[in-house]
Amino acid sequence: MKRFFMLFAALFLAVSLKAQIPSAKCSADGVVRAGGSFVMTVDINKCDLSCYAQFQQLLPEGFAATEISGESDNANFYFENNKVFYQWYKLPIERNAVRLKFNVAVSEGVKVGKYEIPGYFSYQVKNRLGQIDTPVTVTVQ
């Protein structure tokens, strides 16, 4: 019986610790036409983080991002040198999830094909850095 209790306690602890690990995922309309646009969505499960954090996405040449009003979850938005950048000096504490949405325009001259778009969510807690990769694939037709 003692072994059963210890096994149950270890399993409960492992599940509890797993639940406290932040996660992030980036998604987009899978297909876009050159000259068109699509919405990029970033879902971040920040758990109980309330620290400095940032999200970055490096767009290919010919792609340009603009902020969608009201969809930045209190982050500062920048787009420069093909890089989308959201920055929080302190993540919102009211909830455990954050959602970002921004518009991506694809210029007429972009070649047809698949584009792997790298990105990441990074945060700092007690002088330790954490980073979660958030790649996404978009096909230009």
Residue ranges and their predicted role:
Residues 45-50, 58-62, 107-109:
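Short solvent-exposed strand-capping/beta-turn motif centered on an Asx-Ser/Thr pair
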Residues 91-113:
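Low-complexity, intrinsically disordered segments enriched in Ser/Thr together with acidic residues
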Residues 10-18:
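Hydrophobic h-region of N-terminal signal peptides that target proteins for export
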Residues 19-33, 77-79:
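Low-complexity, acidic Ser/Thr/Pro/Gly-rich terminal tails and inter-domain linkers that flank the onset
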Residues 2-10:
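Sec-dependent signal peptide recognition
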Residues 30-51:
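Short beta-strand elements of extracellular/lumenal beta-sandwich folds
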Residues 105-136:
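Serine/threonine-enriched low-complexity regions used as flexible
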Residues 52-91, 134-136:
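A surface/secretory-pathway sequence property marking extracellular, secreted
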